[in-house]
UniProtKB/Swiss-Prot annotation:
Cross-linked sites for Glycyl lysine isopeptide (Lys-Gly) (interchain with G-Cter in ubiquitin): K170
Protein name: GTPase NRas
Source lineage: Eukaryota, Metazoa, Chordata, Craniata, Vertebrata
Organism listed in the record: Rattus norvegicus
Propeptide residues, chain positions: 187-189
Domain of life, source organism: Eukaryota
InterPro entries listed in its UniProt record: P-loop_NTPase, Small_GTP-bd, Small_GTPase, Small_GTPase_Ras-type
Amino acid sequence: MTEYKLVVVGAGGVGKSALTIQLIQNHFVDEYDPTIEDSYRKQVVIDGETCLLDILDTAGQEEYSAMRDQYMRTGEGFLCVFAINNSKSFADINLYREQIKRVKDSDDVPMVLVGNKCDLPTRTVDTKQAHELAKSYGIPFIETSAKTRQGVEDAFYTLVREIRQYRMKKLNSSEDGTQGCMGLPCVVM
């Protein structure tokens, strides 16, 4: 069984825990209890492959930002979550993305942009804005509602597919001999 280490990041109160709990336990948590760090595991079948999802639900609060580097190092893919009714959380996505790229020392890290709370009538982040941001990053964008479960599986499963593509790309580049053990071309003298 293939294991995938997924990390859910985003500002405080955007619904990271609600999304994760909706996926894992099939219910909506409506009271807000700020997370420090929670880990969940779930076995699912995605595209015919049995997968073990190891999901790290992270703190959005700024006072826990020092912990971010550690979980970013171990994560293979990232759900970058903002709330469609919170423009600041949308603006913060770039900070999370830059930190992930810095910690992973790579511009090519599997990510999915997630606009949560799409069940709410008031929207301050336009869908078009979010699509444009995702396109500029070269990553998928999915709108979700942890409350109605809309898009929840799609978001996590899309991230697994992104990780699969990334793994295949890495495998193919190492098999064709263009990459050495240090990720550099090999030269024989």
